[in-house]
Each structure stands twice: as structure tokens, then as C-alpha cells.
Amino acid sequence: MSSQHCAKEKRLFQQCQQRPRKVENVRLVDRMSSKKAALGTLYLTATHVIFVENAPDTRKETWILHSQISTIEKQATTATGCHLLIRCKNFQLLQVIIPQERDCHDVYISLLRLARPVKYEELYCFSFNPKLDKEEREQGWLLLDLSEEYKRMGLPNDHWQLSDVNRDYRVCDSYPTELYVPRAATAHIILGSSKFRSRRRFPALSYYRRDNHASICRSSQPLSGFSARCLEDEQMLQAIRKANPGSDFIYVVDTRPKLNAMANRAAGKGYENEDNYSNIKFQFIGIENIHVMRNSLQKMLEVCELKSPSMSDFLWGLENSGWLRHIKAIMDAGIFIAKAVEEEGASVLVHCSDGWDRTAQVCSVASLLLDPHYRTLKGFMVLIEKDWISFGHKFNHRYGNLDGDPKEISPVIDQFIECVWQLMEQFPCAFEFNERFLIHIQHHIYSCQFGNFLCNSQKERRELKIQERTYSLWAHLWKNRADYKNPLFRADPSQTQGTLRLPTAPCNFMYKFWSGMYNRFEKGLQPRQSVTDYLMAVKEETQQLEEELEALEERLEKIQKVQSNCSEVKSKPSEPSKHSGFSTCNNSAANTPQDYSGNARSFPSRTPSQGDEDSALILTQDNLKSSDPDLSANSDQESGVEDLSCRSPSGGECAPSEDSGKDRDSDEAVFLTA
């Protein structure tokens, strides 16, 4: 680091130490509304920017984590004050007007420093305390176990083994310590292959298909240049092919555009030469690099920030950004790999340049298409843990956790999350989780509130002792899993089992703009009630009705049994009664079977002359009600299906429901397309 940069950093730090604790008479502008700006106080804490409105009836608060701040733009001073525009990584946009220029400058300098910490220990997760004890924190990190995930796939087996060749990260410092490799791949072959691969990221297993032995492996690009070759690397690919007895070849998928891969040859890198590798089929996909993706997202967000654009302007801007074309390219790669594994029974090796961006996207999309387990709540967490966190996706560099090179920032995992959402739109019953689940994961990738997405590798996280010092996001999401359930999810084989097969005709798969993600803070663009919440309420009401129907059917069955017993008694010859008694089958009694069967003649009247032996078969109405709680229910149940939202536990007057304080219009939620 240069002395000039250090001096600048020192000045920023000193200014930040003297940051204003609060600034009064600040106005928060709603850029998408004509409403008057809200007047309030702006607070700067060690972790958040907080705006509190002055209105005594609402006192609405807006909280923003410093780690969520992407850019801060100081605009020209006007008669109303100094304008500050804060753009966030979760696509929130705030415009505040500060009366005094000096205060605005102080806030600007402070936020620049607070939004770009220089050490991991300054991040929010190291001070975040959800009031859980040590044992609860440890249990949170144990929620997911990758060794169990590989066992679920059927590993180890005759073809694949768990290798400790990377113990203590001695071969590749961005790989996990435990990796599955073909049994035919010796330590010598693995070491030789690693030396011939960029960043020493040799081919390792990502996903295994138990029923046909096909696999998805991942690596980085080979250091082939124009003519270099490596015997061990060639043997490694042969070992992957032999681990699948059902196929005599493997696909090698390079996710880069061919022109980019060829340009890498000049730097001594490149791609596999089919003349040197036997029994491989090579395929280029054409996903652009991180710089193109960063610029594409920026262009799309500029369109989202337009005030009242015409439909043609919005669509033109969206098309010009190229964002959905990039999403389609990632999806096409995942579809190609899934078809190769499912339909051809062939194994696939996937790589890009270094094997931690496009490779992670493509492997995880393909796995999601192939395996319904990854379309469940816990399965999706495992997928991210396996293909992103464990295999060394550079979270710190890609999402700007610390102050660093802005050219390294790129929305790589954001694109994967959007691919999942696009699939959910096409297969609404195939995913156990809902849109809110995806949005919350995206939010916490940038929030640094939990320790899961820190650092660039497993090695760095262990050196920082992340699990001992922070909390796991997965435990938080699992605890609140009821909020993330998809009400349309069905355990139907046609929807949830096996491979998701997308339409082959391009016109049958429509890629949509995800307003729920990119416009989620623009309240005027969202329905007054979440579609998911509305459907969940309908599902709960339906479940209550089904339970009530089942209870009524059970009651009816019991009453019909009593009716049948009475009929049997009637058919027997009358005997003198040893003891006098009252009729136990009085047609005038309340709650008689006639109320349900509509047949008054089917229940005989009894006289005191009938014997005890026969009367033992008959229950009095009082005994019937006291012996079976289902039969002694309130009269509102006897009439059929009561109003489930207005049942008082005490049986008294209808108590107000939980939703009684909500807007009446919420029952008429407007279903909008995403």
C-alpha cells in the first residue's frame, strides 16, 4: 500500500472519529412519490444510519446498515439545503436533504469511512448479539453438515472416495480440506493436475447422480497456452470418465465466450486441447466476465431509478442493459449440464477462468434442476454452502465487505439467486421456499450481520475463527422457516421429483424483470398485501376447514354406529324389564341422529319394559355427550362449518381476529406479475 493511500486513509479515519452523532431538521425525500419530504433527525451509530421522523403519531424509523451502503453521492447545494444520495447493495435508495453544508460534508465523510471498513473485525457480525448463549451459537453452525450431504448422494462408493490430499490447504488454499475425487485418481495425479490448473484448483466433485453414476465436477482453466500439456491432468479427466461406467466420454464445459478463452491462451492459460484429452466433448457456453455483469447491473438500476418512465423507455432501458440476456446465458449452461447428466448419463467437468464465479453459478443451477432436495428450504442452504461457500467463492472481493478494488465487485451470486426465482416463476409448485426467502438471503450476503458470507475461502474463515465469534444465518432462517414456506409447494412427482425440464422452445420460457427484488423498497410498485401472505392465509383457512370436516365425519360415523345398535335392539323380541327405566332413544331428545341423517324412523322409541341387557347397547344422550368430546362440541359446530376466524376459546362472543386491525383492503390483495 502506498504512503499516499495510507495518509488518505488516516485522514478519513480521523474525520470519522469525530463524526456527528446526529443531525436535526433533515428531510427524507420519497423519490417515487409527490408527497412532501418527511422531516426528522439523522443518527449515525457505529453500525447503522438511522432516520427518525418527527411526526409524533408515527415516529417512523428507517435503518440502514453501513455494510449495505454501495455508493454515497454528494449533490449540488440548493436553497433547501445539501442533497445526499445513498445507494444500497440491497437496491434501497435514499435521498436526504441536510440544511447546513458543513453537516452534510461531515456526514458524507463519515459514511465513506463507515461503509468501507479496512478490517473484518469492524464488520457488524462481530458485534451483533442476538442474545443466544454459546451452545446455541454452536448448534446454529452445526445445522448443515456437508458430509451428510455427500452421504445422501451415495458417497463414498466404488467409484468415488473422500480425499485428504488438501489437508491443511497444502495443495489449494481456496478449496476445502475434504474433497471427493475418483478412486482411480492417486495423490500423484491430483498434485500434477493441480500444478496445471489456474490457482491450483484441480477437478473435484460437485454433484453425483446415484442412479446413473453421472457426475458434475468443477475446476479452473488449464495452463495450456498454445501447446502445453500435462499427463497427470489428462489422467485426472480419464479417471472422472471411468468413474461413470455408463458413458464412454465426458463433457468439458467452458462457461466463457470462446473469444475470451482464446485470449487467455496468450497469457499461458486457455482451455483443453481435444487432441490431448481422449474421449472428451468440448462445449463453450458464453457467459460474460464479472466486469460486463457489473456494468449491466448498473445500467438496469439506472432504469429502475427513472421517475415515471414510459413503458417503451423502461423496456428499451432493460433491453439495453443486457441483464436478462446474461441470466438466460447462465440458465442455458445449467440446462445443458442437467440434460447431459439426466438424458445422456454423461459426466461433466465445468470451469471458467479461476473456477469460483461462473463455475459456481452453473454447477448450482444444474444441481437445482436435477435434484428436488435442493428445492427445499434446507436443501437450498446446503447447495449454497457446498458450491459457493465451501468451494471458495470470493465473497469479500465480489460484494465489497472491506475496502478494496471496486473492479473486483460483481453481482455473481445475485444472478444465481435470480435464476432460482425465474425457475420458481415457471415451476411454482416445485419449490418449498418462496420469494421472500431468496430476498432475505440476498440481503444478508451484503449485511455482514452473520458470518457465513465473510472472507474469500474456508481457510480465511477458519483463521478468523468465524464460527466461534459470529452467528450463522442458516440457523436464523431455519428458526423462522414458517415465513419462507411456499403455499403452492406440492409433494407431487410431476412437480417436485426428478429433473425440472424446461420448455425447449425459447418462446415458452419467458424471462421476467424481478420487481420484487429490484423495486422492493418502492411501495407504490408493490401490492398492498404480499401474494405469498395471502396464499398462506388461504392455505391455513383451507387446512382448518379440512380438519373441521374430518372431525364432523368422525362424529357422523360414531352416531351412525349408535343408530345401527338401536336398530339391532329393535329387531330383538321384547322381554320384561327387571328394572324400570326411561327410554334412552327419545326422538324428541336434542342432538339425535335425525339431526344428521334426516331419517326419524330409523331410531326406535323405547319403553321402560325393555330389559337391561338390551339397554346396555344404547347410550343416553347425556352419556353420549359426556363420553365423547367430539360429540359434545358447541352448537355452532353441529350446524356444519362455523366461522373459523370468530371462535372464542371460551365459547362466548366472537373475539376480534389478529387481522382485525389491518386494512380491510388487504383481503382484496391485487395480484401483480413480478
Describe the predicted segments one by one.
Residues 2-348, 364-674:
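Cys-dependent protein tyrosine phosphatase-like superfamily
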Residues 354-360:
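Ser/Thr-glycine-rich phosphate-binding loops at phosphate-binding pockets of nucleotides
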